[in-house]
């Protein structure tokens, strides 16, 4: 009985599948060239439908809304750059007369002033900018001092009120104190060479040689008391003053640095 029931169920399943099945006719395999004949009317009807038109309008509005902020940002950035350029040109025109006069009188200072406009620190605080430029001149010497004796280097930067208030002046004073012994030996051995070594590197000596010699006498007076040779050297400085001024005007007469390793 069970076998017969299973056979009947299998026959019923075959009959049901046969009634639901369909056969694809070969005429459906028509060439693709004949299909587009029926598409244009359907496509035009679809575009004329209100729902499709509303969807297309929504897409167009979204595209225009996305493009509008980008164009506005580009216009704002161009306007901002234009305003910055105009402001910079106006500032340069204000300083052109004084800068032209400065270029004739002192070209080095003129070049330094030209860099002020391109430096944010110079625009905010000119004094701090100039102090930074002076510190950069002493950086090689400070680097050597930090490598040779770090303790002295740290002491120079932290232990003196002058170092905190005016670091370039303090560093210059400390460097002069370090080279005074070597300069004293050079002054005793060859006073003319000593003066030639100091004059080109001292602004006071270039502008006013008499005041410079007076300053050097005040510095070396304690040494003159202890060493008569130094007192004799100080007297020779006054005699060599015309020669030193002439050597400043003629670089060919300036001797090379003696004992350059000391500096």
From Swiss-Prot:
Cell cycle as UniProt keyword: no
Keyword Iron-sulfur: no
Keywords attached to this entry: Repeat, Seed storage protein, Signal, Storage protein
Entry superkingdom: Eukaryota
Protein name: 22 kDa alpha-zein 16
Pfam families: Zein
GO molecular function: nutrient reservoir activity
InterPro entries per record: Seed_Storage_Prolamin, Zein
Record function comment: Zeins are major seed storage proteins.
Signal sequence residues: 1-21
Family, as annotated: Belongs to the zein family.
Annotated tissue distribution: Expressed in developing endosperm.
Further information: The alpha zeins of 19 kDa and 22 kDa account for 70% of the total zein fraction. They are encoded by a large multigene family.
Gene responsible for this protein: AZS22-16
């Amino acid at each position: 009985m069970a076998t017969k029931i299973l056979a009947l169920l299998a026959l019923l399943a075959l009959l049901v599948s046969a009634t639901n099945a369909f056969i694809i006719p070969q005429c459906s395999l028509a060439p693709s060239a004949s299909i587009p004949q029926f598409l244009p009317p359907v496509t035009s009807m679809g575009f004329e439908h209100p729902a499709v038109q509303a969807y297309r309008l929504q897409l167009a509005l979204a595209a225009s809304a996305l493009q509008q902020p980008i164009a506005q940002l580009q216009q704002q950035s161009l306007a901002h750059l234009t305003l910055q350029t105009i402001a910079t040109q106006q500032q340069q025109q204000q300083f052109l007369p004084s800068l032209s006069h400065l270029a004739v009188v002192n070209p080095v200072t003129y070049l330094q002033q030209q860099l002020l406009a391109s430096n944010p620190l110079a625009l905010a605080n000119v004094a701090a900018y100039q102090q930074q430029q002076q510190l950069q001149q002493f950086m090689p010497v400070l680097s050597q001092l930090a490598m040779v004796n770090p303790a002295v280097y740290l002491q120079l930067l932290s232990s003196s009120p002058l170092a905190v208030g005016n670091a370039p002046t303090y560093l210059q004073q400390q460097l002069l104190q370090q080279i005074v012994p070597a300069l004293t030996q050079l002054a005793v051995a060859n006073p003319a060479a000593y003066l030639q070594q100091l004059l080109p590197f001292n602004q006071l000596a270039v502008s006013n040689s008499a005041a410079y010699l007076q300053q050097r006498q005040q510095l070396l007076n304690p040494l003159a008391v202890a060493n008569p040779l130094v007192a004799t050297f100080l007297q020779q400085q006054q005699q060599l003053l015309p020669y030193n001024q002439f050597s400043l005007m003629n670089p060919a007469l300036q001797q090379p640095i003696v004992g350059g390793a000391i500096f």
